[in-house]
Amino acid sequence: EGGEVVTSGLLDFFLYCAMDSTYRAKHLDGTWLSGFAGSLAREALELYRLPYAQAVKKSKRFDHVERMTDVAKVASNYIDLGNQCGEGWFLTGDMIDLIEKGAKQIVCLQPFGCLPNHVSGKGMVKTLSAAYPDVRIAAIDYDPGSSAVNQANRLKLLLATMFE
């Protein structure tokens, strides 16, 4: 159909979780120790993926890898970093990262009836659509209660409008 699947790496999710621990320690009910552990984990994970990030940056085929602190900074313009339900601010930051790298169509899949992701994902669609009017975002629920035909039709509709 002409589309490409792009998703965050698993390491990005771990980095998000580490940053949440740090935020919780500074602003919510987290302990100093959990905040320190989160900061240490984030730095260690960023250091671990540094060779990968440098190699990808040199590549002509792949987009460069953003540091999670940069993703958080951009996301904080639209959603508070204290939003830690589901994927919280990471989902918004990830969509913005895709948009800034040239994506004009985004499918936000909501798996297994995950209410927190449903709220944070669909809740940000209107805000991001207003900020980026040339981008189309479709939130599609993928769970046993959803119609497979409806899911496929919504995806095909988004793909059909991709080249207009």
Stretches with model-predicted labels:
Residues 1-164:
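An N-terminal assembly and electron-transfer interface module characteristic of large anaerobic redox
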